[in-house]
From Swiss-Prot:
Highest taxon listed in the record's lineage: Bacteria
Record keywords, A-Z: Hydrolase
Name of the protein: Uncharacterized hydrolase SAB1253
Alphabetical list of PANTHER family matching this protein: METALLOPEPTIDASE, PUTATIVE (AFU_ORTHOLOGUE AFUA_6G09600)-RELATED, PEPTIDASE M20 FAMILY MEMBER
Any one Gene Ontology molecular-function term assigned to this protein's record: hydrolase activity
Keyword Hydrolase recorded: yes
A Pfam family it matches: Peptidase_M20
Family: Belongs to the peptidase M20 family.
Enzyme Commission (EC) number: 3.-.-.-
Coiled-coil region: none
Amino acid sequence: MNELEFVTKHRRHLHQHPELSLHEFETTAYIKAFLDSLNIKYDCPLETGVIAYLEGNDSHTIAYRADIDALPILEENDVPYRSQSDHVMHACGHDGHTTALMLFVQRCKDMQDSGQLPQNVVFIFQPAEETGGGANRLIKAGAFDKYPIEAVFGIHVNPFADEGIAVIRDEEITASATEYRFFLTGLSSHVADKEQGHSCGEALQHVLTQISQIQQFHLNGLKRNIVHIGHFKAGEAINTVPSNGYLEGTIRTYDIDDLTIVKNQMQKIAESVKLLFNVDCEVKFAEGYPPTINSPKLRTQIEDALIKADLNVYDKPTPFLFGEDFSFYGQQLAPAYFVFIGTRNEDKGFVTGLHTSHLNFDEKVLINVVNFYENLLNNYKEV
């Protein structure tokens, strides 16, 4: 089959069989079977995900990463290859990322067989980008200890940019993503004896109001930060004073100082609840993803490789507010660079955003991705 047939076949198979973070068992088996067919050795440091390696003609070692997990979303695309898993969908394009890396593996194996693979290459089929911090898990598991990786590259499909556009930015290209949760515990009573209880209902209203004001009163208005409330609940019945409350959301910032401000304000809010309502309140923060930092030292190589892949380069003036665990590679492993590849095509109706039930794209864009990867490989220079 030709390369367009290759990416169409594999991407649509993966699209039909999406799996959630840390449950990508069939996806992992599919990738392993593909690698076995090429007689390529690989490791599985975690229960899901695969790390493959090909030795080249030089001592330099570079890595390419694709995430393989999906999202708990019911697909609404009316296509023959729609998800066969109820309420699970590749709504972030990871099926495309995985497919592009598979084709690149095949190209690299062909080069190795002919004695023309210029560098050593590590292929990272990474699980759990969406919720499990798979990149950090792999690093902590020692998945890369035996590879002297000098640089890590990755891409993400981007329905906000047209086909043929590559979006880049030095330094921060995505925001940090930190989850927070408030837990409230009061004292229940019948609504007729409301004064006998300690209501988490009113206390939760206070928390909601105060969180909503953090961005307005405590953060620089010229910076794009997000303090988002995603879900909240108080009580169980309409005629009782609620004895419990819960609220959760996410924080997106570009620098550690702003994140510290938000965390400190949330801690003060939690402390104020006890004083005002006699309700115990605790706030907890889940380990988040740091900002993705693109190494400026890799910029020239990235731009040249994109242009040679017939992609028009757009230098984004501000970072995306997405969270992305590719950030851990640049933070802990090696200089890294992350590129967004445009997939928007209004004529074909490919216009909906990431994490939506109608996300779709033309597989031909994946050929551009692989050309970009190969250009990087052929012209890589140590930084």
